[in-house]
């Protein structure tokens, strides 16, 4: 390569390394070829020291000017950082407190809902109580009015009691008259029934009707005739009845309802009246019943006397007496 080209490509700046510091400055114009190498070297050193001194002075000046400001800024930054840290701590504390307060607010909302529900229930109860109170007041007014009426009636009680006593006495009299009227009506009805039966040929005695036949029949035929008239051959249950019968028979034999079953049987009344054997002893003709010929199983009234009963064959034909109890009918 030609020397001229190498000169053109030579570096146009110089630098030195001093304890890790690098200094760079522009290349001085190429020394004249007439300077000796010994003179060029000290000159370069002086320039380098001069530049270095300028750099140091500039650095010191800059530090003197900007260091206080920089330190102030650093202190401000530290202060701001400390303040921010305090605020962050405060914010963390506030966040925790906020969470606590939020929980309290939630609890308060729940309590508020409970209170609102309770308040609604209380209001409903108050309305119900007001309604009940109104009803009670209305009833109280009615009771007050009724009490006034009671007071008014209380003053009339003595008079009403006297009227009630009079009415009770009058009612007793009316009841007595009504009972008497009913008895009279019963007697009239009884008299009417008796007259009707008498008109049909019956006789009345002590609550019974008696029919004295005009046609003689056997004992069995006579009983069938009585049954057709809702009666039976007569029974005798007292001495007064015995006297009535034999007097009405007037000494003419009449069949009565006393019979027995066979020669060894007991006497009985066909109308189911209980037969009093001891009492009947006073009504038999002396020596009767004798069951003459072992065929006398039916009794008749034979004579006009208290002792008028006689036993005879049931196939004999006699007049007869039917007996029918009087039963009052209601219309």
Curated annotation (Swiss-Prot):
<protein>
    <recommendedName>
        <fullName>C-type lectin domain family 4 member K</fullName>
    </recommendedName>
</protein>
<comment type="subunit">
    <text>Homotrimer.</text>
</comment>
<feature type="transmembrane region" description="Helical; Signal-anchor for type II membrane protein">
    <location>
        <begin position="42"/>
        <end position="62"/>
    </location>
</feature>
<dbReference type="InterPro" id="IPR050111">
    <property type="entry name" value="C-type_lectin/snaclec_domain"/>
</dbReference>
<dbReference type="Pfam" id="PF00059">
    <property type="entry name" value="Lectin_C"/>
</dbReference>
<dbReference type="InterPro" id="IPR033989">
    <property type="entry name" value="CD209-like_CTLD"/>
</dbReference>
<keyword id="KW-1015">Disulfide bond</keyword>
<keyword id="KW-0735">Signal-anchor</keyword>
<dbReference type="GO" id="GO:0030246">
    <property type="term" value="F:carbohydrate binding"/>
</dbReference>
<dbReference type="GO" id="GO:0051607">
    <property type="term" value="P:defense response to virus"/>
</dbReference>
<keyword id="KW-0175">Coiled coil</keyword>
<comment type="function">
    <text>Calcium-dependent lectin displaying mannose-binding specificity. Induces the formation of Birbeck granules (BGs); is a potent regulator of membrane superimposition and zippering. Binds to sulfated as well as mannosylated glycans, keratan sulfate (KS) and beta-glucans. Facilitates uptake of antigens and is involved in the routing and/or processing of antigen for presentation to T cells.</text>
</comment>
<keyword id="KW-0430">Lectin</keyword>
<dbReference type="InterPro" id="IPR016186">
    <property type="entry name" value="C-type_lectin-like/link_sf"/>
</dbReference>
<feature type="topological domain" description="Extracellular">
    <location>
        <begin position="63"/>
        <end position="331"/>
    </location>
</feature>
<keyword id="KW-0472">Membrane</keyword>
<keyword id="KW-1133">Transmembrane helix</keyword>
<feature type="disulfide bond">
    <location>
        <begin position="226"/>
        <end position="322"/>
    </location>
</feature>
<keyword id="KW-0325">Glycoprotein</keyword>
<feature type="disulfide bond">
    <location>
        <begin position="298"/>
        <end position="314"/>
    </location>
</feature>
<dbReference type="InterPro" id="IPR018378">
    <property type="entry name" value="C-type_lectin_CS"/>
</dbReference>
<dbReference type="GO" id="GO:0005886">
    <property type="term" value="C:plasma membrane"/>
</dbReference>
<keyword id="KW-0812">Transmembrane</keyword>
<feature type="coiled-coil region">
    <location>
        <begin position="106"/>
        <end position="197"/>
    </location>
</feature>
<dbReference type="InterPro" id="IPR016187">
    <property type="entry name" value="CTDL_fold"/>
</dbReference>
<feature type="domain" description="C-type lectin">
    <location>
        <begin position="205"/>
        <end position="323"/>
    </location>
</feature>
<dbReference type="InterPro" id="IPR001304">
    <property type="entry name" value="C-type_lectin-like"/>
</dbReference>
<feature type="glycosylation site" description="N-linked (GlcNAc...) asparagine">
    <location>
        <position position="90"/>
    </location>
</feature>
<feature type="glycosylation site" description="N-linked (GlcNAc...) asparagine">
    <location>
        <position position="116"/>
    </location>
</feature>
<feature type="topological domain" description="Cytoplasmic">
    <location>
        <begin position="1"/>
        <end position="41"/>
    </location>
</feature>
């Amino acid at each position: 390569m030609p020397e001229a080209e190498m000169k053109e490509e030579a570096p146009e700046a110089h630098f030195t390394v001093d304890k890790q510091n690098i200094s760079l400055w522009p290349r001085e114009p190429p020394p004249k070829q007439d300077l000796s190498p010994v003179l060029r070297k000290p000159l370069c050193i002086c320039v380098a020291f001069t530049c270095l001194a300028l750099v140091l002075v500039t650095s010191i000046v800059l530090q003197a000017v900007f260091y206080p400001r920089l330190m102030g800024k650093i202190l401000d930054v530290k202060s701001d950082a400390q303040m921010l840290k305090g605020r962050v701590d405060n914010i963390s504390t506030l966040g925790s407190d906020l969470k606590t307060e939020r929980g309290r607010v939630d609890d308060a909302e729940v309590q508020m809902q409970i209170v609102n529900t309770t308040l609604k229930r209380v209001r409903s109860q108050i309305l119900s109580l007001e309604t009940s109170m109104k009803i009670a007041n209305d009833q109280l007014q009615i009771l007050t009015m009724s009490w006034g009426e009671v007071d008014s009636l209380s003053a009339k009680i003595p008079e009403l009691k006297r009227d009630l006593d009079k009415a009770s006495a009058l009612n007793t009299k009316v009841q007595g008259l009504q009972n008497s009227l009913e008895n009279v009506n019963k007697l009239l009805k009884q008299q009417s029934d008796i007259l009707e039966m008498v008109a049909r040929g019956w006789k009345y005695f002590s609550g019974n009707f008696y029919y004295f036949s005009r046609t003689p029949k056997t004992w069995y035929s006579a009983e069938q005739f009585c049954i057709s008239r809702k009666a039976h051959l007569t029974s005798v249950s007292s001495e007064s009845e015995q006297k009535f019968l034999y007097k009405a028979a007037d000494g003419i034999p009449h069949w009565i309802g006393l019979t027995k079953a066979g020669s060894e049987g007991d006497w009985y009344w066909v109308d189911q009246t209980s037969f009093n054997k001891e009492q009947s002893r006073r009504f038999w003709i002396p020596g009767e019943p004798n069951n003459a010929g072992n065929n006398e199983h039916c009794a008749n009234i034979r004579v006009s006397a208290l002792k008028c009963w006689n036993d005879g064959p049931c196939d004999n034909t006699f007049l007869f007496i039917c007996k029918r109890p009087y039963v009052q009918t209601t219309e």
